[in-house]
């Protein structure tokens, strides 16, 4: 039972501080610092895989067009992508369950599934937001040029940082805020060269609906990423494949509802989800599914900011590959842009830019020191079986780790 930020055991009536969003962030950071070498290796693999998948996506989208148009329904692509990810999550759950040790709670039991579903109900929020965003990507092409869409997507960097600050209680130093601003500038400088001459306001269509789509296009995916990270990390001990099963299952449901909506407005023929698809679109679906799966590892074991930097680096490598293999010319804007991006990345992840706690985890004000010592004593006694003294542990301490170290 939870009351006034404190959880009380219904059996022994001991009290423990309830985790807050900041507790989730702190606990994760402390857990991560213990496995820094594995963390760096995982980050390298995540960024490398993301660069490959993001780099392939523009090529597959181009190959999916027929006479410059899409012959398939965008919602059908999103639905098939979610179904692919659900199948992958189920397969990985089966493999993981077979490797469980004796005495561990079975992953595939009904009780485990129901309990995990309750604990991860928040994943329905990013699933809905992703469904909206994936459809919006195609809609944006109707109102803006591709270069303008890229320019607008740059605003997500700052929006994500602001949302992380308020939702995840993440703290950024002044140097890190400057690094994020540099990232925004670097990407913009790179893409300015692709905007046609004579286009005003970066090609913005001055209509009310265009501005509404712009606001949604920037806000929705940022909210989805941050809420996804919060939902995954708040249940850190739950298998990521089980969490993905819920996330992708919700996504498939929302996209299927979108298909039913198109049937109502466009007729029964739009229910054929395979209409207009080709071999290229099947590769596109697999690529999108792989990106979604990889993103879940970013959000649970890394963070949203690293994912954004990774996607930026992937775009840069795509430009370099185009110059090397397709003969495209590298502009001055591109070279200046990537230089600014790499400076931003080095600055953001530099140890000097890390936010330091105002006070160490064990530091307290002098007047609170005596109370803290009695609280620690109560906690020790509780572990020894003295449940009567455990009720002294009622002070709110957001620095208390949520995750097991």
UniProtKB/Swiss-Prot annotation:
- Taxonomic lineage of this organism? Eukaryota, Viridiplantae, Streptophyta, Embryophyta, Tracheophyta
Q: What is this protein called?
A: CMP-sialic acid transporter 4
Task: Relate the protein's function as given in its record.
Answer: Sugar transporter involved in the transport of CMP-sialic acid from the cytoplasm into the Golgi. May transport important nucleotide sugars such as CMP-Kdo (2-keto-3-deoxy-D-manno-octulosonic acid) in physiological conditions.
- What GO CC annotations are associated with the protein? Golgi membrane
Q: How would you describe this protein's topology in the membrane?
A: Multi-pass membrane protein
Give UniProt keywords alphabetically: Golgi apparatus, Membrane, Sugar transport, Transmembrane, Transmembrane helix, Transport
Give the InterPro entries listed for this entry. Answer: Nuc_sug_transpt
Q: Name one GO molecular function term.
A: pyrimidine nucleotide-sugar transmembrane transporter activity
Q: Which residues lie on this side of the membrane: Cytoplasmic?
A: 1-43, 96-121, 165-171, 225-244, 303-322
Family per record = Belongs to the nucleotide-sugar transporter family. CMP-Sialate:CMP antiporter (TC 2.A.7.12) subfamily.
Source species of the chain: Oryza sativa subsp. japonica (Rice)
